[in-house]
């Protein structure tokens, strides 16, 4: 049976979230289901207090706390932390992202093949 990853999209650009949703629908092994979306790190943090997901596709640069700050906050909290794949137009933040235990770092525009590879890495990590 093909696993289904529960994905939370966090990006301040609605069109970027729409594009990611479309790309995720094309992924088949593993499959991905978008369980929620947020346009700001503060919204994401509030949602994550009461919900869980397997993966957060997280933009780096957003108004208010950015994606790197959100990842740092999530890493410090108690309990399991979802896998994080950063999705951004800014490649210069990659090193910091991996210091925060990111599974991958995708640059925009995201290609389906790269997203599929990142989903496979997340599924492997969850299976361990």
Range-by-range predicted roles:
Residues 1-8:
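Non-catalytic signal-transmission and effector/linker regions of two-component phosphorelay proteins
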